[in-house]
């Protein structure tokens, strides 16, 4: 069978994506995609004169003057999801969208060259993925059945950038506030392994301090995974974020654990990034969403 005929994904640049928004009257999508907002006008006649329309007709994305039905259905999931799971992936240090370039034009929609971004959006039972790499966005249907399937997608994305084995460390839970304070002073010393005394006093082993220092100071690759739920016009983020860091000492996973009833203290898990523990991290992110069961929650 012709492989081209079996493909369902579409790839457009940021301008092409904005044209799809205009054709479907979609104001905005997940901010991580860094797309331009669309403001409705009285007439869309100008769209037919845009050179991008000819390209999208050639690709079958636009048929006559309407967006292909499958593409339109996916775009509508991205426009008004019940839930979004976001993964920011980077070769080297994750910059969280900050581009240090004084020549960057105001209002730029660029993302850092070393990053790519994945948004998994669900509306009802329809899951859609939008992946931004450089100036291009690829949109497709995606199968998500449980936290393990999301963890597998994240790990596949990270492996496409860089391979690392799980760090040879033991999993440990530490108080979040203490860890943040200790890491702040440790960072000032350049994550010198001999300056990690505060971490050692929290029960973190010397091997973990060494591997963590390498991953924090000079990561070969990083991922941050978090989620959002929507309810009417409100949105609520997950309380936990999963962070994966590849250092010379291997791949480490860090995530804030779900708070137990009656506990006022937040705890941070630091562990080797095995597939099983990455899945636990993803599940924790989803379990700390504010509006209930992530698989079935509806925004209305």
From Swiss-Prot:
Gene it is expressed from: espG5
GO CC entries: cytoplasm; peptidoglycan-based cell wall; plasma membrane
Organism: Mycobacterium tuberculosis (strain ATCC 25618 / H37Rv)
Protein name in the entry: ESX-5 secretion-associated protein EspG5
Membrane spanning residue stretches: none
Record localization: Cytoplasm
Membership in a protein family: Belongs to the EspG family.
Disruption outcome: Deletion does not affect EsxN and PPE41 secretion.
InterPro entries per the UniProt record, alphabetical: EspG
Swiss-Prot/TrEMBL keywords: Chaperone, Cytoplasm
A Pfam family the protein falls into: ESX-1_EspG
Subunit structure: Interacts specifically with ESX-5-dependent PE/PPE proteins. Forms a 1:1:1 heterotrimeric complex with the PE25/PPE41 dimer, via PPE41. Binding of EspG5 does not cause conformational changes in the PE25/PPE41 dimer. Forms a 1:1:1 heterotrimeric complex with the PE8/PPE15 dimer, via PPE15.
Task of the protein: Specific chaperone for cognate PE/PPE proteins. Plays an important role in preventing aggregation of PE/PPE dimers.
């Amino acid at each position: 069978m012709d492989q081209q005929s079996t493909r369902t994904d579409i790839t457009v640049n940021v301008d092409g994506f904005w044209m799809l928004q205009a054709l479907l009257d979609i104001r905005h999508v997940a901010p991580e995609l860094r797309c331009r907002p669309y403001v409705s006008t009285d007439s869309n006649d100008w769209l037919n004169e845009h050179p991008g329309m000819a390209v999208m007709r050639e690709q079958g994305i636009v048929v006559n003057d309407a967006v292909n039905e499958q593409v339109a259905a996916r775009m509508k999931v991205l426009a008004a999801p019940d839930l979004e799971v976001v993964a920011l992936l980077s070769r080297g240090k994750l910059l969280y969208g900050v581009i240090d370039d004084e020549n960057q034009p105001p209002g730029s929609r660029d993302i850092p060259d070393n990053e790519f971004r994945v948004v998994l959006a669900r509306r009802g039972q329809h899951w859609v993925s939008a992946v931004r790499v450089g100036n291009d966005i690829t949109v497709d249907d995606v199968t998500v059945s449980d936290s393990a399937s999301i963890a597998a997608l994240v790990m596949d994305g990270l492996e496409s950038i860089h391979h690392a084995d799980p760090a040879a460390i033991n999993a440990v839970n530490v108080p979040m506030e203490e860890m943040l304070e200790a890491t702040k002073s440790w960072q000032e010393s350049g994550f010198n392994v001999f300056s990690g005394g505060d971490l050692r006093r929290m029960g973190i082993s010397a091997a973990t301090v060494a591997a963590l220092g390498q991953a924090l100071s000079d990561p070969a690759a990083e991922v941050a995974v978090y989620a959002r739920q929507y309810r009417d016009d409100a949105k609520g983020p997950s309380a936990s974020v999963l962070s994966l860091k590849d250092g010379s000492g291997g791949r480490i996973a860090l995530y804030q654990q779900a708070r137990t009833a009656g506990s006022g203290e937040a705890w941070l898990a630091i562990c080797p990034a095995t597939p099983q523990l990455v899945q636990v991290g993803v599940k924790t992110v989803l379990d700390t969403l504010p509006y209930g069961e992530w698989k079935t929650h509806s925004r209305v």
